[in-house]
């Protein structure tokens, strides 16, 4: 069984993330969505909320693709998480050259730690290249319309959290 790991903070999950997840399901039999517990980032949504939103959105994808999608929180090194879930490949999304520079360094470090686990990059579709969770939160916080960047469920959660009812 081919197992892939798509890691991220997903605070919140965006249409860009969902697009990468959908496309990653074409490459593996089981896709683990690794939700990073990154206390330094000070997430808007706690871990349970992020996991719930991801599970809700991925349930639809599982039905459409037939690929098993599992959500797995982690706080350890990414390469250790990959080992823990039995992943042979780490999936990363790229939006721009700036993403590549960071990801290139990460691949080098991960390969030094375990060269049996590959990393593959999926380029964001053009319509999703500008989407970043940080920007979505800022737009929502300032009262802007984020419907082009997130699902209705996530838009509703953002409005609730930021008191925009």
From Swiss-Prot:
Enzyme Commission number(s): 2.7.7.3
Covalent S-S links between cysteines: none
Residues under site feature: Transition state stabilizer: 17
Pfam families registered for this protein in UniProt: CTP_transf_like
Residues that bind ATP: 9-10, 17, 93-95, 103, 128-134
GO CC annotations on file: cytoplasm
Pathway: Cofactor biosynthesis; coenzyme A biosynthesis; CoA from (R)-pantothenate: step 4/5
Positions bound to substrate: 9, 41, 78, 92
Complex formation: Homohexamer.
Role, per record: Reversibly transfers an adenylyl group from ATP to 4'-phosphopantetheine, yielding dephospho-CoA (dPCoA) and pyrophosphate.
Protein name per the record: Phosphopantetheine adenylyltransferase
Organism: Ruegeria sp. (strain TM1040) (Silicibacter sp.)
Gene from which this protein is expressed: coaD
């Amino acid at each position: 069984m081919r197992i892939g790991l798509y890691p991220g903070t997903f605070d919140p999950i965006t249409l860009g993330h969902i697009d990468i997840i959908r496309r990653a399901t074409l490459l593996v039999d089981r896709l683990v969505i690794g939700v990073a517990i990154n206390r330094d980032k000070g997430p808007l949504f706690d871990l349970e909320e992020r996991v719930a939103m991801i599970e809700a959105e991925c349930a639809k994808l599982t039905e459409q693709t037939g690929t098993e999608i599992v959500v797995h929180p982690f706080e350890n090194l990414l390469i250790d998480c990959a080992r823990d879930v039995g992943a042979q490949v780490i999936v990363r999304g790229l939006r721009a050259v700036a993403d590549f520079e960071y990801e290139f360094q990460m691949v080098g470090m991960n390969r030094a730690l375990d060269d049996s686990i590959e990393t593959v990059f999926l380029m964001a579709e053009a319509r999703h290249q500008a989407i970043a969770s940080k920007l979505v939160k800022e737009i929502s916080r300032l009262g802007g319309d984020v419907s082009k960047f997130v699902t209705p469920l996530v838009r509703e959660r953002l409005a609730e959290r930021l008191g925009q009812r």
